[in-house]
Amino acid sequence: MEYEFLKDVTGVVKVRMSMGHEAIGHWFNDEVNGHPEILAEVEAAIAGVKGSERQWQRVGREYTLLLDEEEVMIRANQLGFEGDDMEEGMNYYDEESLSFCGVEDFLAIIAAYRAFLLGR
């Protein structure tokens, strides 16, 4: 999994993720941007589920983060979209709406994101 942090001309940090992990970048950009306290909440939740079979969930404006001891899943809240109203032959594109990664990888992204924010 590859990622990149960018700062736009207004100073807003954007996270760009490799293919298959785009929803993680969207989560950082849409949910965390301007609310770094969310990262501490997620880290505390990871510590809280460690060694157990419990899960933890944080529902945001656009994305929901669900984690257990081993894996983090981020999905768009709109992913439950029903395609019944779509024309025949049309598909709902959701490749960028759902991503999975290991807890350790996710913690590494959080650490790198913080370091980027602090200019390290």
UniProtKB/Swiss-Prot annotation:
Q: Where are the transmembrane segments?
A: none
Question: Pfam families of this UniProt entry?
Answer: UPF0231
Q: Which family does it belong to?
A: Belongs to the UPF0231 family.
This protein's name: UPF0231 protein ETA_08290
